[in-house]
Amino acid sequence: MSLASGGVPTPVCEPGRPWPMGVVPALIGGRAGINAAVPAPHATAVELCLFDDEGRQETARIRLAARTDNIWHGFVAGPGAGQRYGLRVHGPWQPEAGHRFNPLRLLIDPWTRSLSGPLARLANEIGYRASAPHQACAHDNAERVPRCRVVDIAEELRAGAAIM
């Protein structure tokens, strides 16, 4: 484990699998952890940001290790069900071409099965300045975005807690 900029630890990320989409519990090579698979065809990098149990403090920022076709993916041994996380995606800022990549914006995984945190003002979280839509927003929004939570669907079903 090394330290990324800002002193956030960076666990080792292995290639993992490009499926299923989202961040899910996984057993790869006999080790338990989480596998992330995020389609982002125009991205230059995708980061998985892990947070503490309350979702307040970022505990690790992990650059996904592999890309298969248009899917960025990686496996991190250790974390499992209940882990809170978000995504950051790097790429071109070209609004005229429909590309508004902004790694200062913490994103919600569209495949997450659980969110924790306030949703009331979520519609205000855009990656550009409202008064100047062709300029990227220069402020990190992590403190205002709900955290995704890794869910073990099989365990939820065994416990009778999953709603399908």
Positions of predicted regions on the chain:
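The feature marks proteins involved in alpha-glucan
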Residues: 1-30, 58, 67-71, 75-164
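Beta-strand signatures of extracellular beta-sandwich domains
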Residues: 47-49
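Short proline/glycine-enriched turn/loop motifs at strand-loop junctions of beta-rich domains
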Residues: 39-45
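Ser/Thr-rich low-complexity repeats and stalk/linker segments
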Residues: 62-64
